[in-house]
Every structure is written in C-alpha cells, then in structure tokens.
C-alpha cells in the first residue's frame, strides 16, 4: 500500500502524473508475459494493473476477453499467476502492483486467504470489478488486514454519498471511470470529471487515476489537466499484444513505442 503513497509523492515532486498500463497475466504465455511486463516498466510505466485470467469477465470488452482466452490456451492458472507476481516483485521491488479481478476468484481461495496470498507475493492493491462499494465490507476488511489497498471505481455519475464512501473506504488510488465512449468526446467528458476530482479531493480520497478508453497521449494529458493523478490504459496495450502474437520481439518493440509517449504526456 505504501508503494502508492511514495510513488505519488515522487511524481508530485517531479511534476508528473502516473502512467499505468494494464495487461492480463500469462497472455500470451508465462514467459512472454514476464518480458512484456519488464518492457512496460523499462518504457516508463509508473505502476502496473494486472488481470488474472477468469472464465467470465463481465466488465471486459472483447480485447481483454481475448487476452484471457490466450492465457487459458497457454494453460495459465491463478496459482501460476501468483508465482509470476512474486517474480515481478523480486525483480521490481518499488513499483506498485495492482490486481483487477472478479469476486469468484477471491471466493475460490477464501477471502482472507486470497488477500494473505496477495500480501505474501507483494501485491499492493486489489480492485474487485464486480463488487459494488455497498457490498465490499468483507473484501476491504480482509484487504486492510493484509496491508493491501482496496480500490474502488468512481463512475462519472457518482452521487455525493458514493463519493464519500469511496473516499472513506478506498486506499492506494481511486479508479476514475472515463465517460463511456470518451474518445472523440473529450470536451464533454472533461467537465464532470473536473467536478468529481474536486469532490474526491475535498473528501480526502486516494489519488484518482482515470481509466477506460485511454489510448492516446492527448487523453493522458487531458486526464491530468482535469486533475487526475494519472491514467490507466488497458485495451490499447492488449491490442498491441494481439496484433503481434506471432512476433514476440516486434511485440515488445511496439509496446515500448506505445508506452514512451504515453508516459511523456504525464509530464507537466
């Protein structure tokens, strides 16, 4: 959890926002997945958001569902994912690592065991995509017992009550949802986000990172101009993996070429 605090403090000093890529662990196979993560970090990723392959990913679009299917095809299991997480943590001791996942995977292990395992391998945060704030008590309590930040999604239409709950229960960062279909509608989307960012700040919420539909440097810049602490990009990165599935070296080069300007856009 503290890794997020020190990251945001360092970035503030350097007048930068955070660029956070999302990938599915084990896509397209364990070995290449580790190379992908090293490449993202070398290219400037400030933190990682990682998915554990799950058979019924509700909140994911087709791109990330395909990533899950590729990981399954490679025989990747949740147990292997935790081994990979331990390896990433050994190699990169300071980078914040977040998991984005579904409640079933947590239940399968037992809520407390799941968060204990996260703590053991060095995971900093967990966002359980299909658990709303009002049902989150057993998850967030187990998370805090094991030094893991519970992350909550702040939708663009969040009312005051929800904003207060997110501020009070969330740690690490707040996942600020871009308006649905933000691309091409940045100007319309910027207004409500400014308002949400101001409210979250007022209620002392964890720093907001804007996610969903972030695929170009100007969107990263817009998120930071609206007051977000950074931006999360998932589908755009997973698409690059998909496009170069049979060319592992080209894939890594393309990922690097994508991440560098995205990170550069966070510099004020």
From Swiss-Prot:
Q: What is its EC number?
A: 4.2.1.20
Q: Name one Pfam family in it.
A: Trp_syntA
Task: Give an example GO cellular component term for this record.
Answer: cytosol
Q: Does the keyword Amino-acid biosynthesis apply?
A: yes
Molecular function, one GO term: tryptophan synthase activity
Q: Where is the active site?
A: 49, 60
Q: List UniProt keywords, sorted A-Z.
A: Amino-acid biosynthesis, Aromatic amino acid biosynthesis, Lyase, Tryptophan biosynthesis
Q: Which InterPro entries does the UniProt record give?
A: Aldolase_TIM, RibuloseP-bd_barrel, Trp_synthase_alpha_AS, Trp_synthase_suA
What reaction(s) does this enzyme catalyze?
(1S,2R)-1-C-(indol-3-yl)glycerol 3-phosphate + L-serine = D-glyceraldehyde 3-phosphate + L-tryptophan + H2O
The UniProt subunit note reads as follows: Tetramer of two alpha and two beta chains.
Q: What does this protein do?
A: The alpha subunit is responsible for the aldol cleavage of indoleglycerol phosphate to indole and glyceraldehyde 3-phosphate.
What this protein is called in its record is Tryptophan synthase alpha chain
Lineage, highest ranks first? Bacteria, Pseudomonadati, Pseudomonadota, Gammaproteobacteria, Enterobacterales
Gene behind the chain? trpA
């Amino acid at each position: 959890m503290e890794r997020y605090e020190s990251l945001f403090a360092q970035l503030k000093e350097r007048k930068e926002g955070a660029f956070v890529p999302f990938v599915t662990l084990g896509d397209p196979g364990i070995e290449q997945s580790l190379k992908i993560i090293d490449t993202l970090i070398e290219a400037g990723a400030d933190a990682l958001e990682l998915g554990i392959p799950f058979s019924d990913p509700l909140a994911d679009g087709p791109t990330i569902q395909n990533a899950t299917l590729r990981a399954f095809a490679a025989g990747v299991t949740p147990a292997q994912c935790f081994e990979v997480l331990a390896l990433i943590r050994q190699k990169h001791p300071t980078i914040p690592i977040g998991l984005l996942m579904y409640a079933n995977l947590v239940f399968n292990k037992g809520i407390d065991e799941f968060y204990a395992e996260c703590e053991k391998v060095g995971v900093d945060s967990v966002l359980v995509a299909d658990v709303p704030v009002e049902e989150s008590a057993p998850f967030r309590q187990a998370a805090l017992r094991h030094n893991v930040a519970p992350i909550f999604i702040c939708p663009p239409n969040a009312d005051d009550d929800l904003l207060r709950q997110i501020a009070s229960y969330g740690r690490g960062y707040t996942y600020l949802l871009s308006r649905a279909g933000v691309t091409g509608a940045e100007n319309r989307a910027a207004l409500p986000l400014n308002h949400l960012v101001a409210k979250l700040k007022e209620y002392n919420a964890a720093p907001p990172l804007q996610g969903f539909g972030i695929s170009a440097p100007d969107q990263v810049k817009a998120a930071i101009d609206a007051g977000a602490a950074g931006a999360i990009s998932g589908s755009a990165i997973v698409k690059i993996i998909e496009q170069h599935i049979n060319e592992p070296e080209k894939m890594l080069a393309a990922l690097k070429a994508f991440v560098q300007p995205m990170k550069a856009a966070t510099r004020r």
